[in-house]
């Protein structure tokens, strides 16, 4: 099993500026990060199998509270597989198998424990996918959906939570007058923010983003990135992205994965500018991947 570099790092390889230099004023290297922020979740010696194929190999990864952690690496390296394991999406397909644990703190719940209800896991850990996936319902009912599953029936409570979630997703001003319209009437960027609001309505502790801007235009992408920057004040975020400039812009910490293994983990600025592992350097400079 490969070791993980804790925040703070080790002796560095030659400087790399191409990716880090592309980041804007919101880049997380401008923030003063504590040496060891509090943990919100952690993968512990976690392996995953699609049938007989081992897709993830003994992953140990810290996820820090109210920070953004980016997962980068070439296609097929296991980024999305790891992300989906965090809220039990793999349970929906037969033949999949876990080893190890993914824990949510502070109660230290092993999210993979069969005794833990996957629906409750998905309430605590929301997920936003590559392409916007609003339900064939009204804007209002999309946001209220998770609350209704939880048994909420009070209209006043639902109204308040829907408004709060839409404001949290920076969408309220655009849809307040059209809550009963179909969600599919929204633009692609608005639909993605609606999906974020749907997650926020259940007050999640962690948000998972699986390439959330890959299907969006540059303006909508900038809007989602700005929203992620705001959301980190309230929730912990884990994001998969193929866009290394995006990882540099939005994340505090970055993990580089390859062939199902975690190769390197550290503060984003450090990993992009002074990676410890040669494999990481080759990937972020375009010599591989």
Swiss-Prot record:
- State one molecular function term (GO): ATP hydrolysis activity
- Which PROSITE patterns does the UniProt record give? ABC_TRANSPORTER_1, ABC_TRANSPORTER_2, PSTB
Gene Ontology cellular-component annotations: plasma membrane
Annotated membrane topology: Peripheral membrane protein
Q: List ligand-binding residues for ATP.
A: 73-80
SUPFAM superfamilies given in the database record: P-loop containing nucleoside triphosphate hydrolases
According to UniProt, the name of this protein is Phosphate import ATP-binding protein PstB
Q: Tell me the organism.
A: Aromatoleum aromaticum (strain DSM 19018 / LMG 30748 / EbN1) (Azoarcus sp. (strain EbN1))
Identify the coding gene. pstB
């Amino acid at each position: 099993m490969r070791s993980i570099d804790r925040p703070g790092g080790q002796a560095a390889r030659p400087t790399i500026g191409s990716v880090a230099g592309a980041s804007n004023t919101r880049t997380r290297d401008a923030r003063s990060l504590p040496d060891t922020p509090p943990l919100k979740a952690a993968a512990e010696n976690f392996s995953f199998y699609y049938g007989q194929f081992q897709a993830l190999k003994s992953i140990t990864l810290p996820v820090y509270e109210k920070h953004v952690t980016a997962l980068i690496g070439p296609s097929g390296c296991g980024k999305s597989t790891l992300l989906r394991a965090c809220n039990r999406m793999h349970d929906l397909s037969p033949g999949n198998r876990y080893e190890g644990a993914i824990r949510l703190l502070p109660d230290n719940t092993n999210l993979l424990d069969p005794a833990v209800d996957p629906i409750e896991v998905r309430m605590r850990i929301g997920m936003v996918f590559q392409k916007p996936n609003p339900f064939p319902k009204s804007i209002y009912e999309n946001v209220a959906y998770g609350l209704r599953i939880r048994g909420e029936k009070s209209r006043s409570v639902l109204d308040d939570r829907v408004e709060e979630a839409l404001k949290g997703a920076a969408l309220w001003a655009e849809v307040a007058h059209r809550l009963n319209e179909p969600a599919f009437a929204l633009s692609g960027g608005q639909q993605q923010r609606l999906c974020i609001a749907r997650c926020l309505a259940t007050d999640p502790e962690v948000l998972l983003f699986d390439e959330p801007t890959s299907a969006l235009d540059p303006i909508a992408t900038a809007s989602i990135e700005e929203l992620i920057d705001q959301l980190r004040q309230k929730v912990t975020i884990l994001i998969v992205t193929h866009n290394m400039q995006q990882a540099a812009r939005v994340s505090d910490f970055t993990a580089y994965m390859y062939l199902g293994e975690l190769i390197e983990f550290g503060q984003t600025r450090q990993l992009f500018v002074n990676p410890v592992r040669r494999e990481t350097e080759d990937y972020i400079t375009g010599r591989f991947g």
